[in-house]
Amino acid sequence: IEKMSEHHLKSGGKRLRALLTLESAKLTGYKDEIRDINLAACVELIHSATLLHDDVIDESSLRRGVKTTNSIWGNQSSILVGDYLLSRCFEIMVQDGDLEILQLLSSTSSKIAQGEVLQLQHKGEADLLEETYIDIINLKTAALFSAATKTGACISGSNDKEKKALESYGRNLGLAF
């Protein structure tokens, strides 16, 4: 598991979602630099797990110019490593103890899975409705961007108005991404 996880995590990427968590926490006054790093790692673990699963679903052999985990070790191992990364994320969140963040990131993980299923249901549709397309990217992409920014606000103990503003910013950024 360690070798496969390391291969995937070292295969590149911008770590944008984790950065959004860190910067949102900083923007809203967080200074401790421990919880934000741990919870930004959770956001990145969720994203990495979804990429591992997505590569299996899409039968991808390359991601960012590097062989995918599933192309090296097989689909079954890749799915299990994705599940492992999600489990590690939940362990970190439970240790953190913030139920609002646990609820936010667990529901976001569910939304991402729903978005993937919705995309599969409409695969190959040339006449895909714009509304359906927006629903898919809202669930698959924007949900995690939104959760990343809101998590940063939660870490710093922001008020509801600040949380909603950062959540909205993340969602809009994710839709544009």
Give, region by region, the residue ranges found by the protein language model.
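Mg2+-dependent prenyl diphosphate-binding active-site environment of isoprenoid biosynthetic enzymes
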Residues: 2-177
